[in-house]
């Protein structure tokens, strides 16, 4: 794959051309100055990010999945974001999935040639039984990675939603997806080291997409992660704290209520705020597809 002279991520950075001559303190300040460009580049993509969130959420309401595909750093960031969704938002591991070129081995070491296999992602998506209601997010700093492009083409062929996240535009990726997200962070501190500014931008965008989708799906109440899975002591304490905050209860009362509701944060909150039984709370949640805000707004409207 020849070097593209239009590629920002592969261009030399004049601000760091002699970074090896700087003192360590100056080096740190120079890298920090470059990093400050990243949030602005991401903020400039607010519109397509919001479009992606709404489109993904709409499909997930009807059984669709969110699937990330990437290679190298981009792939690892997708895996990281997908892995955090079950403990944070109580999703099934099958709802948010990440595919990385080279498979699990590529999480900890480079797998030579994996990103150049344009058919590999298509095969992996076929193994997931990709459906039209799924959403596929291709992540590639350059916007040219064959593994990602092949996966996007496979997704488009069956009518799945396609989203491209790249730090170059125009690029083959951003030009063939339904929604293009392109935070242009400029040349890297070290030429071509896209684990730096490009990777940081990708992480911020993925954070926003997954969090925004889960908020739209009712996985939060305010800023409380009310669908979390309390799988360890820290998360159990967090669940108790969320019930206490949402219902203005002391810690002991919140813990007791949560235990009585089998550890279900949403159920406990509704029991406290609505004065109903746990079973009634579960029924309300089922009718509202788990959206606690929708349940409370509906009940308040009926009581007016």
UniProtKB/Swiss-Prot annotation:
Entry EC number(s): 4.2.1.126
Keyword terms, alphabetized: Carbohydrate metabolism, Lyase
InterPro entries hit by this protein: Etherase_MurQ, MURQ/GCKR, SIS_dom, SIS_dom_sf
Catalytic activity from the UniProt record: N-acetyl-D-muramate 6-phosphate + H2O = N-acetyl-D-glucosamine 6-phosphate + (R)-lactate
Active site: 84, 115
Enzyme class: lyase
Molecular function GO labels: carbohydrate derivative binding; carbon-oxygen lyase activity; ether hydrolase activity
A Pfam family annotated for this UniProt entry: GKRP_SIS_N
The protein's annotated pathway: Amino-sugar metabolism; N-acetylmuramate degradation
GO annotation (BP), single: amino sugar catabolic process
Domain of life of the source: Bacteria
Domain SIS: 56-219
Miscellaneous note of the record: A lyase-type mechanism (elimination/hydration) is suggested for the cleavage of the lactyl ether bond of MurNAc 6-phosphate, with the formation of an alpha,beta-unsaturated aldehyde intermediate with (E)-stereochemistry, followed by the syn addition of water to give product.
Family membership: Belongs to the GCKR-like family. MurNAc-6-P etherase subfamily.
Physiological role: Specifically catalyzes the cleavage of the D-lactyl ether substituent of MurNAc 6-phosphate, producing GlcNAc 6-phosphate and D-lactate.
Subunit structure: Homodimer.
Name of the protein this chain belongs to: N-acetylmuramic acid 6-phosphate etherase
Gene label: murQ
């Amino acid at each position: 794959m020849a070097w593209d002279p239009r590629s920002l991520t592969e261009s030399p950075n004049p601000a760091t051309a002699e970074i090896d001559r700087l003192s360590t303190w100056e080096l740190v300040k120079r890298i920090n100055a470059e990093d400050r460009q990243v949030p602005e580049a991401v903020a400039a993509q607010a519109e397509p990010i919001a479009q992606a969130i709404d489109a993904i959420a709409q499909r997930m309401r009807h059984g669709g999945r969110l699937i990330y595909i990437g290679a190298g750093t981009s792939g690892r960031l997708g895996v990281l974001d997908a892995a955090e969704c079950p403990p944070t938002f109580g999703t099934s591991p099958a709802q948010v999935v990440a595919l990385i070129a080279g498979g699990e081995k590529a999480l900890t070491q480079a797998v030579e040639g994996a990103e150049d296999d344009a058919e590999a992602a298509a095969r992996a998506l076929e193994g997931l039984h990709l459906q039209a209601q799924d959403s596929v997010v291709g992540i590639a700093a350059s916007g040219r990675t064959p593994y990602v492009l092949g996966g996007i083409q496979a997704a488009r062929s069956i009518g799945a939603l396609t989203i491209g996240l790249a730090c170059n535009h125009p690029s083959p990726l951003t030009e063939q997806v339904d929604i293009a997200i392109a935070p242009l962070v400029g040349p890297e501190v070290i030429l071509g080291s896209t684990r730096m500014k490009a990777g940081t931008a990708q992480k911020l965008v993925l954070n926003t997409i997954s969090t925004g989708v889960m908020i739209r799906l009712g996985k939060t109440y305010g800023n409380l992660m009310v669908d979390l899975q309390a799988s360890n002591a820290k998360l159990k304490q967090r669940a108790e704290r969320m019930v206490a905050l949402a219902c203005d209860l002391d810690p002991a009362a919140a813990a007791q209520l949560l235990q009585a509701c089998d550890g279900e944060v949403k159920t406990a909150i509704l029991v406290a705020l609505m004065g109903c039984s746990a079973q009634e709370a579960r029924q309300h949640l089922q009718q509202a597809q788990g959206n606690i805000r929708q349940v409370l707004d509906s009940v308040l409207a009926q009581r007016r």
